[in-house]
Amino acid sequence: MSWNHNRRWKDFQALVNAEDYFAFFELPYDPRVVNVNRLHILRKFAQYLAPLEHFQGSEEERLEQARQALEKAYQTFLTSTPQQEKLFRVFQDYGCPDPVGGCAGCSSLGERGECSPGIPA
């Protein structure tokens, strides 16, 4: 590991916000990316962390796995969007048929609030 070896799992578990996680693991990040995608990065991070719940390696190895999970979650949102990742129900149930272009071209809402493409005149 290239970061501080004095970190402990219990210290990691006490962290509460994205910036704290990046500081803890000494990972560089663009604050603009984190500000826009904060909840999505943390949700993706939690998904990647789930398998570590039963991790049998050392504390240092576990922390390295967590560090890699955060880096992977962050990297995801450098090349993808929340709409593409569909981590939250709003993007799963009520997705726009055009996730790249957004809903600007939509003219009506379907029964469940789905975005419906505009009908040509």
From Swiss-Prot:
Disulfide bonds: none annotated. Keywords: Nitrogen fixation. The keyword rRNA-binding does not apply. GO terms for biological process: nitrogen fixation. May protect the nitrogenase Fe-Mo protein from oxidative damage. Belongs to the NifW family. Homotrimer; associates with NifD. This is Nitrogenase-stabilizing/protective protein NifW. It comes from Synechococcus sp. (strain JA-3-3Ab). The gene is nifW.
